[in-house]
Amino acid sequence: MKEWNKKSALWMLLYAVLYAVGTAIVCVTGAITPVLFVCSQITAGILLSGIIIYAFRKVKAPGVAACLGLAMILLLLLIQDAVAWHVIPVIIITVLAEAVRAVFKYNWTGDVIGTVIMTFSSFGYYGQIWFNRDYTYECAVEEMPAGYADGLMAASPAWSLIVVAVAGIILSLVISNITAKLFKL
């Protein structure tokens, strides 16, 4: 499928649902331990890249990232967590991924870069540990077991943002290439 039609739209619905479910899994793993919360981008690189690159390669036309971003926003609405900290990054990342794909004329390079960008769609969820630490700490104290908040702060020094982002990017590139080889994209 190179462009939008009824068949590609139905497949995109499936990709969007898989993307939303994968994103939910990424977010839920953070409840297991503070280290997994800090490593959310790494988990996203592993769990979401295959879905995203598959969708991008199957529909080489505008709107694919928008469908995935919309699925993410619908998920946030469903779980009643559609706050600015979460929704605005999704919108920015979606627009950026669409723009990159368009600039590269929907070729492999643009799709891989777009995939890496889209794996950051849940950054507003976990990025607060670096940019809104007091709020994150308060939420962790209220919502998580005793000691989780302190563990989260200990596991997220400023430098860890760079390590997590780079690892997430590398894993996204690797998973995209593995997916392409497995599914002959």
Residue ranges and their predicted role:
Residues 1-6, 180-185:
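Short, charged juxtamembrane terminal tails flanking transmembrane helices
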Residues 2-60:
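Hydrophobic transmembrane alpha-helices
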Residues 6-15, 40, 44, 63-68, ...:
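Alpha-helical transmembrane segments of integral membrane proteins
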Residues 16-24, 70-79, 117-128:
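Aromatic-anchored segments of alpha-helical transmembrane domains
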Residues 21, 90-126, 176:
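Short helix-perturbing small/polar motifs within transmembrane alpha-helices
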Residues 29-38, 100-109, 181, 185:
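Membrane interface segments of multi-pass transport proteins and intramembrane proteases
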Residues 40-98:
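Alpha-helical membrane segments and adjacent membrane-interface helices in multi-pass membrane proteins
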Residues 112-184:
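Membrane-embedded alpha-helical hairpins and interfacial helices in multi-pass inner-membrane proteins
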